[in-house]
Regions:
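Short beta-strand/loop motif that positions the catalytic acidic residue
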Residues: 59, 65-67, 71
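Conserved alpha/beta-hydrolase "acid-adjacent" motif
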Residues: 72-78
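Short glycine-enriched nucleophile-adjacent loop
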Residues: 17-28, 33
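C-terminal catalytic histidine-bearing segment of alpha/beta-hydrolase fold enzymes
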Residues: 87-136
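Conserved serine/cysteine hydrolase catalytic core
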Residues: 48-61
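Short beta-strand immediately N-terminal to the catalytic nucleophile in serine-hydrolase-like folds
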Residues: 10-12, 36, 66
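Active-site nucleophile loop of the alpha/beta-hydrolase fold
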Residues: 34-43
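Gly/Ser-rich "nucleophile elbow"/oxyanion-hole loop immediately N-terminal to the catalytic nucleophile
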Residues: 1-11, 15, 132-135
Length: 136
């Protein structure tokens, strides 16, 4: 369909944000990733043997994480745990926390929508993809 496999990028929201982190460690062809408020830590189960914090050393592509400071489902201490893991791994990654935003702050159909954070996050995502996504 005209896609360019040499410019493979991914983004995801909520559970898809978690999968975005994991996919960045899974696919060596990936160029860039942006994870929106994806859970970073958790109990290991048969269905979830690894979490993003477990794969910080294995990232194949630069990842930008976008999180809400008021997200009750993803506590800030878990975001800080991920930041420390990324720094320790010397990973090409960044995490932005929007202090006034909660979970799903980019979902304009939900009460949690936070327009200012959503717009800034979207611009950061586009810039991240432009910087790391490869040239046409």
């Amino acid at each position: 369909n005209g896609g360019d496999a040499h410019r493979l990028m991914i983004t995801g929201f909520c559970w898809g944000g978690r999968i975005t982190w994991l996919y960045a460690a899974h696919n060596p062809q990936l160029k860039a990733a942006v994870a929106w408020y994806g859970k970073l830590v958790g109990e290991k189960t048969l269905n979830s043997p690894k979490h993003p914090v477990d794969i910080a050393t294995d990232l194949n592509a630069p990842v930008l994480g976008l999180y809400g400071g008021q997200d009750t489902g993803i506590p800030l201490d878990t975001v800080e745990t991920m930041r420390h893991a990324l720094r320790a791994a010397n990973a090409k990654a960044d995490i932005v926390v929007y202090p006034d935003a909660g979970h799903a702050f980019n979902a304009d159909y939900r009460p949690s929508y936070h327009a200012e954070s959503a717009k800034d996050g979207w611009q950061r995502m586009l810039a991240w993809f432009s910087q790391y996504g490869g040239k046409k």
